[in-house]
Amino acid sequence: MVLLSITLLIAGLAISGITLIAIVLSIANPEKRLWPPHHYTRITPMIVWIPTFTLALILICLGILGWGTLPLPTWLRYGIGIPVIVLSNAAVWYEALQFGMAQTGGAKGTLRTTGFYRYSRNPQYVADSMMVAGWSILSAAPLT
């Protein structure tokens, strides 16, 4: 179990590191940016969603493997963790559907200023972060 957890942790850190490098390179050299893509093709969603869902699966697995390891009270785990996961998941999917899956995956679109975009330029990322926080609280696992 420890070896599996370490392997998953390394894989998750690698995906996160590669993503961070792509973002930094895109900011540093916009003409050769990796994100958002210059041209949206059929493989663009795969490039975006495979690492994203792989990282989510890794976080789920790490939470299951370390379930209940941290001494968090039950009321906190279930009373806060579950509602945060449910509400943030609803926010992500609501905005993704309003935004359009292609534009969410990097296709050109229009500036949105309605819905949660009234409050943040990146509400899906904010909600994704909240979802991870909710899962960390619920699972009470040290590696999430």
What residues fall within each predicted segment?
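Membrane-anchoring alpha-helices and their flanking helix-loop junctions
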Residues: 1-113, 129-144
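Short, amphipathic, aromatic/basic-enriched membrane-interface segments that mark the entry/exit
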Residues: 112-122
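Hydrophobic alpha-helical membrane segments
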Residues: 121-131
